[in-house]
Amino acid sequence: MNINGIPPTIGRRLAVQIASATVPGTQHVMPGRPNWKNNQDGLAVSSQPCGTTIAVVCDGCSAGERSEVGARLAAPMLVQILEEELAQRIVASRLHWPDIRNRLIHRLLTVATLMGRDLQQVIREYFLFTTIGFIVTPEDTMIFYIGDGVYIVNGIPTVLGPFEDNAPPYLMYAVTGSPVFDRDPSLAHFRLRRYRTSELKSVGVGCDGVEDLMKCSGRCFPGTNEVVGEIGQIFTPPFFENPDRLRRHLARMNRETAQGSRVEPGLLPDDTTLVIGNIGWV
């Protein structure tokens, strides 16, 4: 409230600055060794004129040979479904998440079925991934997730997981079945965190690779004496003014260097993908 008792956001428009980036982990590019696995993450972002912003990050299962396919399909699919839902309900807290989940599963199943092979095998190979995202509307902000990952609200990170046997829940286990869901059926559904947007300055979501990013604050960029610094720096203006700044920051952290005859990998062993937003009013 201001001195007149009027909320400071009344009569002002929500404005969310967005930055996003993804880099493959060193365990995927395997510096100095003749092997390669694709970046298995996917992300999608949508911003509307009213300021409403949606972001989704999907992290493909490392055991899936081509799980990046499902992750990169699911992220924009889920963003589109949320856009459709918000067009009817306006406020994020009124979204019906069981319907959203079922619609996403149905769309992914349509694609998987068209691939013309054993459906269970197709899902295991292509469509196992974790999901985390945020919705920012003028009224409220929702963090939503199935599986592990990291979300950051007003600079404070929250790590989701780890899960028993290092086996996070994947959305498409709803089709294949899994001991993960047998142990805890609630893991098959989106979990939610709600905030009043007027109380937020920043929000971010990322895959579990962001945990490694958080642990690197005291280390130096490979081949330099420059300290990486705290993760909070990515919410400062330079990372939003230059759309490539965040990607370059992650890429510098994962640059491989030569030490004599040995190749030293970068600092991020897992694929690292995140979307961050600074929240303001104009």
Residue ranges of predicted features:
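N-terminal entry segment of metal-dependent catalytic domains or homologous docking segments
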Residues: 1-80, 149, 182, 266-275
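C-terminal catalytic subdomain
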Residues: 2, 183-282
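PP2C/PPM family metal-dependent serine/threonine protein phosphatase catalytic domain
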Residues: 20-37, 109-122, 153-198, 252-260
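Short hydrophobic beta-strand that contains or immediately precedes a catalytic carboxylate
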Residues: 55-58, 144-146, 204-206
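Short helix/loop capping segments that flank catalytic or ligand/cofactor-binding pockets
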Residues: 65-67, 153-155, 213-216
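Short Gly/aromatic-enriched secondary-structure transition segments
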Residues: 69-73, 158-159, 218-225
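Helix-loop-helix
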Residues: 77-111, 222-252
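Catalytic core of PPM/PP2C metal-dependent serine/threonine phosphatase domains
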Residues: 90-152, 187-197, 260-269, 277
